[in-house]
Amino acid sequence: MSRDKNLKEDWEQVLNILSATFGDGELLNLDAIIYLIGVQELGQGAKEFKKDDKVNLMHIAICHLLEPFGYYEFDFFDNDGWPHYKVLEELPPLKSGEQTVLMKEAIVLYFKANKLI
């Protein structure tokens, strides 16, 4: 089975699991999944977040998801319990489709590492 086909099947599994739980009958988009991973990685449970916090949650998720690829490394938790990452390597210039594939690969890896798929 090809790598692309495996990614597609794994991605659909992740999408179906999360959409069934959080989608209210709709399929979640990539940004919503990244946001949910940020909430999970923050570890403070489900609560109301301000707009700036939502952006920061997505940043946490992206850093955490790209850590295994060597782009980021966890640095410290601040006084509010928010994780901070340092850049190890700048992301290469990617086209929109390439960014999407990279994030899907990272999310599938995250779910496999956490034994959720």
Task: Locate predicted features.
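Structural motif
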Residues: F22-L30, K47-L57
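Long, acidic, intrinsically disordered low-complexity segments
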Residues: M1-G23, K112, I117
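Intrinsic-disorder-associated interaction segments
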Residues: R3-L7, W11, G23-E26, V55, ...
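Amphipathic alpha-helical interaction segments
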Residues: G25, E41-Q44, H64-F77, Y110, ...
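Short, hydrophobic/amphipathic alpha-helical patches that form generic packing surfaces
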Residues: D31-G45, L57-P68, E105
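Intrinsic, low-complexity terminal and presequence regions
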Residues: S2-R3, D31-Y35, E90-P93, A113
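Helix-rich interaction surfaces within compact, conserved domain-sized segments
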Residues: E90-I117
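Amphipathic protein-protein interaction modules
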Residues: F49-Q99
